[in-house]
Amino acid sequence: MGSHPITQDNDLDPPTEPGERYFNRELSWLAFNDRVLAEACNDSYPLLERLRFLSISGSNLDEFVMIRVAGLVGQVQRGIDEVSDDGRSPREQLNAVVARLEELSERQQDIWRNLRVQLADAGVHVADEERVNAEAYGWLKQHFFESILPLLTPQALDPAHPFPFISNEGLGLLFTLRRGGEELVEMVLIPSALPRFIRVPGEDALYISIESLITRFAKELFPGFEIVGDGTFRVLRDSDIEIQEEAEDLVRTFRSAIQRRRRGQVIQLEIEEEFDPTAEALLREKLDTPGATFVKTDGMLGIAGLADIVDEDRPDLKFDSYSPRYPERVLEHDGDIFAAIREKDIVIHHPYESFNVVVDFIRRAAIDPDVVAIKQALYRAGTQSEVVDALVEAAENGKSVTAVVELKARFDEEQNLYWANKLERAGVQVIYGFVDWKTHAKVAMVVRREEEGFRTYCHFGTGNYHPITAKIYTDLSYFTADPRLGRDAAKLFNFVTGYVEPRELEMLAVSPIDLRETIYAAIDNEMVNAQAGKPAAIWMKMNQITDVDMIDRLYEASQAGVEIQLVVRGICNLRPGVPGMSDNIRVKSIIGRFLEHSRIYAFANGEPMPGTSSTVYISSADLMVRNLDRRVEQLVPIDNQTVHDQVLQQVLLANLLDNEQSWELQPDGSYFRVEVGEKSFNCHRYFMTNPSLSGRGGALEAGAVPKLALRKGAV
C-alpha cells in the first residue's frame, strides 16, 4: 500500500447499470450484522464475550426490522415504486431482506445452541431444566410467588374481552385451557420491568428464562383448569418517528409521536416452533396486519435478551479488564484542562483514553469563576449524564449556558426530552435546532475571561457526549484554543440557535452548507495530482458510505489513478475492485472488542501518504445523504502537527494495518477475513498498550510511542 497511483486498463468502460455500480443499502447493513455474528463464533474470544456479540446481533436485527423493514413495508403499502440506488423496487428489496433475515435468524439459533453447550461446560447453565433440583425448584417457586405473580395479569381471549394491546418488543405467552369440555385461550404479557433471565443462587450459574418460569408455575395462574397447550410469542412494531415540517410545538409533537410509536403497525410476529395450533390461529387472526411477517423460531425468541447472562461475574470468561488512560499532559498542569489546551491542541482517543477528560472540560468550566459562557450540542447523553449535571451547575453558578438538545435522536427522544426539561428548570437556554434537520454535530465551546481578553476553548468530537458508549466506541475528542476554530464554532451555534447561516468560515466545514463541497474539492485535488504524476491517495474511515454522488466522485478518482483506502465499519454501497471503475479502491471493515465509530478523512496533497503535508479532517459525519444534506455536521481540519501525526500516522494508519479483526469487501459484495500473514497486528491491542502522541506531554520525550510504518499488501 504505497502512495503512488496504481495503473489500470483505461480502455475498459465502467459499468453503467445501477446494480453493477452500487450495493444495496439494506443488504449491506445485514452483511455488517453477519460480521458481528461471526464474532460470536470467534474461538479466540472468551465465551461471555462471544455471547455478547450474539446478543448484539439480535438487538441489531430487531432495530433493522423496526426501522428499515418497516420503511419498506410502508413503501409497498403506499404503492411507491421508486427504485433504490442499485435499481431494486421496494417489493424486490423487501423480499430479499426477509429471505436474508431468515438465514441470519437461523444462524443465530445454531450459534446459540453451540454456545449454550460450551457455557454449560464452563459452569454457566442456561435454561437447563435438568439442573433444577429440589432446592432450586423451591427457590424458583418462592421467587415466582413473591416477585413474578403479583405483576402478571392473565387476559381471556374471547368475544367478551377486548384483545389486549401488545407493545413493541412485547414478549408474551398464550395458554390453551380446558375445563368441563370447553377450551379457552388466555394471554399473559410479560412486563418489560422483569428480567429476561432469572439467576438461581449458587456457585454454579443457573439461569431460567422468564417465560419458562411462568410456564412452569402456570397452574397457579389458572387454578381449576387443565393446560393443554402453550407458546411464547414476540411482537416488533414500526418504530420510526416522522415529524411534519409545519409542527408548531416540537416538544409536544415529539411526546405525541413517542406515544404513537408504542402503537406502531405490527411488522413481525415471532412464535415458537412448537406453538399451540389453537393459540397460533387466534394470534394470527388478531395480529394479521398487512405487511406483517410471521416467523417460527426453533429456539430462543428475542436473542438480544442474552445480554442478561453476559453480566455473570466470571472474569475468566470475559476480556481482561481495561482502564482508560488519563492524558499525562493534563496531569502535568495539575488537572487544569484549560492550561493544557493553551499549551497545545490535544486529541483524546476513546475508549483508550478516558471520557472523563470531556466531562472535566465542562465540569471545570462550570466552577471556574473566569468562565462566562458555555455552549454545548447534545445528541445522545445517556440515562445518567455528568455533562448535563455540569451544565446545570454552570447555570446555577450564574454562567450563560446554551444547550442544543436534539429531540430527533432515534430511540433517545424520550431521554432527551427529560434532559431538556431538567436543563430548562436550571436556567439553561435550551434550543431544539431545526425541525427538518437533525443537529448531529459534536461540539462544545467555553468562553473564558483571561489577561489578554476573552479566549474560546473548543471541543470537537466524532462521537456523542455519552458516558457508556464512550467506554466501547472508538472516537476522537479534539480540544483546541485556536481562535479561528473558536470563531467558527460560535457561527455554528448561531446557525442552529438563530438560523443565521455561517458565512466566511475560517476552518470548519458545516453540512448541509459546504461539507460536501469541501470533500469534493479534496478529492478533485487528488485527481489533479494523479494526472500530474504526483503521489495521490485518499484514506477514509467512517461508519457508512451510501451517498451515490460521493461514491461516483471516488470512482472518478480511482479512474484517474488515485489510490483509495476505505475503512467502513457498516453499510457500504460502494463496489470496490471493479475493472474500469474502482480498480484503485479497497474497502475493509474492522469488527472487534470495540465498536469503530470515529470519522477521519485524509488526502495525500501531493506528497507520499502518510506525510506531514497530508490534509486531515475529523468529522461527525458519515458519507450518507442524510449526513451531507439533512443534518448539521462539522468537518474539522487538523493543523497542529502533533495532533496531525496522531490522527493520521497513529489512528488511521493502525486501522489500515490491522489484520486480526479486519474483513475485506469483494467486488461481488461478500466479505472475507483478511489473512494475518507473517506479522499479525491488532489495532485495538495497539491502542490499549501504546499512549497517544498529543496527550503524553513531557513524557513523550522520555518514552516514544512505537512508530507505525506501511507494509506491502496491507489493506
From Swiss-Prot:
Active site: 440 (phosphohistidine intermediate)
EC number: 2.7.4.1
InterPro entries: PP_kinase (IPR003414), PP_kinase_C_1 (IPR041108), PP_kinase_middle (IPR024953), PP_kinase_middle_dom_sf (IPR036830), PPK_C_dom2 (IPR025200), PPK_N_dom (IPR025198), PPK_N_dom_sf (IPR036832)
Entry annotated with the keyword Kinase: yes
Binding site for Mg(2+): 380, 410
Keywords, sorted A to Z: ATP-binding, Kinase, Magnesium, Metal-binding, Nucleotide-binding, Phosphoprotein, Transferase
Cofactor(s), by name: Mg(2+)
A GO term for molecular function: ATP binding
Source species, domain of life: Bacteria
Alphabetical GO biological process terms: polyphosphate biosynthetic process
One CC-aspect GO term: polyphosphate kinase complex
Catalytic activity, as annotated: [phosphate](n) + ATP = [phosphate](n+1) + ADP
Binding-site residues, ATP: 60, 473, 569, 597
Enzyme class: transferase
Any matching Pfam family: PP_kinase_N
Post-translational modification (record): An intermediate of this reaction is the autophosphorylated ppk in which a phosphate is covalently linked to a histidine residue through a N-P bond.
Known function: Catalyzes the reversible transfer of the terminal phosphate of ATP to form a long-chain polyphosphate (polyP).
Similarity-based family: Belongs to the polyphosphate kinase 1 (PPK1) family.
Name this protein carries in UniProt: Polyphosphate kinase
Species of the source: Erythrobacter litoralis (strain HTCC2594)
